[in-house]
UniProtKB/Swiss-Prot annotation:
Family from the record: Belongs to the chorismate synthase family.
GO biological process: amino acid biosynthetic process; aromatic amino acid family biosynthetic process; chorismate biosynthetic process
Free-text function comment from the UniProt entry: This reaction introduces a second double bond into the aromatic ring system.
Keywords: Amino-acid biosynthesis, Aromatic amino acid biosynthesis, FAD, Flavoprotein, FMN, Lyase, NADP
Name of the protein: Chorismate synthase
Species per Swiss-Prot/TrEMBL record: Listeria monocytogenes serovar 1/2a (strain ATCC BAA-679 / EGD-e)
Length: 388
């Protein structure tokens, strides 16, 4: 299973095409729209989210509420397009309009300058329109489809914010997926710790007042995962590696870790490895989950626990120093409309990309042509691993 996305931040809209879904899987536009709505929320979002009311148009691959096994095409309209029709026109425009909203002063930390160099664009709007996090709208749409597939197989995904601007949630126990879903949805910053959430919101407000931005850390937990997804036999078949790539591919994300993550480097092996248990009711489990549900690049049946770190958004309302590519003189960087903090929204994007990789791994391991046989094979596999 794979997908491609297309579209610019201020173009007519965004498109994704998914190939490889099994036939007969229940899927409605509402399954996607509820995830799009979640992405648009969160304390710290900018004015753009007051304009856009993202709704998906499914234009292919589904009939009467079920997938056909053919490619699924989805489109999300950019309502702000009406203000950008000349600037972002697909057709040629009069010469006097060609330089409207031209960007010649790249923003530090963004794709502007290097993208312009790479593709030979003397207007870096050609770069920023595609490199914008607006593209994650359709990544969330694709992830919503993956989450629906996983849900039907008894696999659930939840994300939450662990840290913003140096304020970290004080979590003294592990949370079940359903509990994460319920608690995070009730928080303006998608945080499980109410006290920390208040401090996070204050830091976001302070950053906005100062024309600055702040980043943070998000965590995604996947429960009900069968053992044996991914493989140890080749480096590129390891599922944790694929998830790490997916996390770091999200705009502004700079790293990923599983389980205790980098803390494992500071502990002896006896405090890191998860002891193996067995019971007739549950089969093989682990006493702890320090490795985040992975051993040898494969799921071990414990919940997947992965975290991603997001840098502050590069667009600053008090811009840093840059250089004009025309004159080579020093100027302040360009300013585009942006958020002061998008970490809460990014947790929804992280859910989407993790769900996608897990869904792909499920379809790689089991028959993926028909959804009814897929469900049967997953259940058979669960029983086999329990009895091993």
């Amino acid at each position: 299973m794979r997908y491609l996305t297309a579209g610019e931040s201020h173009g007519p809209g965004l498109t994704t095409i998914i190939e490889g879904l099994p036939a007969g899987m229940p899927l409605l536009a509402e399954d996607v729209n509820k995830e799009l709505k979640r992405r648009q929320g969160g304390h710290g979002r900018g004015a753009r989210m007051r304009i856009e009311k993202d709704q998906v148009q499914i234009t292919a691959g589904i009939r009467h509420g079920k997938t056909l096994g053919a490619p699924v095409a989805m489109f999300v309209e950019n309502k702000d397009w009406k203000h950008w029709e000349t600037v972002m026109s697909i057709e040629p425009v009069p010469e006097k309009n060609e330089k409207s909203r031209r960007v010649s002063r790249p923003r530090p930390g963004h794709a502007d300058l290097v993208g312009g160099m790479k593709y030979g664009h003397n207007d870096m709007r050609n770069v920023l329109e595609r490199s914008s996090a607006r593209e994650t709208t359709v990544r969330v749409a694709a992830g919503a489809v993956a989450k629906k597939l996983l849900h039907e197989l008894g696999i659930e995904v939840a994300g939450h914010v662990l840290e913003i601007g140096g304020t970290r949630a004080n979590l003294t126990r592990d949370y079940a997926v359903a509990e994460i879903q319920e608690t995070s949805e009730a928080s303006p910053v998608r945080c499980l710790d109410g006290v920390a959430a208040e401090e996070m919101m204050q830091k976001i407000d302070d950053a906005k007042k100062n024309g600055d931005t702040i980043g943070g850390i998000v965590e995604v937990v996947v429960g009900g995962v069968p053992a044996g997804l991914g493989s140890y036999v080749q480096w590129d078949k390891k599922l944790d590696a694929k998830i790490a790539r997916a996390i770091v591919s999200i705009n502004a994300f700079k790293g990923a870790e599983f389980g205790v993550g980098f803390e494992a480097a500071r502990k002896p092996g006896s405090e890191v490895m998860d002891e193996i248990l067995w019971s007739k009711e549950d089969g093989y489990t682990r006493r702890t989950n320090n490795l985040g549900g992975f051993e040898g690049g494969m799921t071990n049946g414990m919940p997947i626990v992965v975290r991603g770190v997001m840098k502050p958004i590069p667009t600053l309302y008090k811009p840093l120093q840059s250089v004009d590519i025309d004159s080579k003189e020093t100027f302040n960087a360009s300013v585009e409309r942006s958020d002061s903090c998008a970490v809460p929204a990014a947790s929804v994007v992280a859910e989407a990309v993790v769900a996608w990789e897990v869904a792909v791994a499920v379809l790689e391991k089991f028959d993926g042509d028909r959804f009814d046989t897929l469900k049967k094979h997953v259940e058979e596999h669960r029983n086999l691993t329990k009895e091993f």
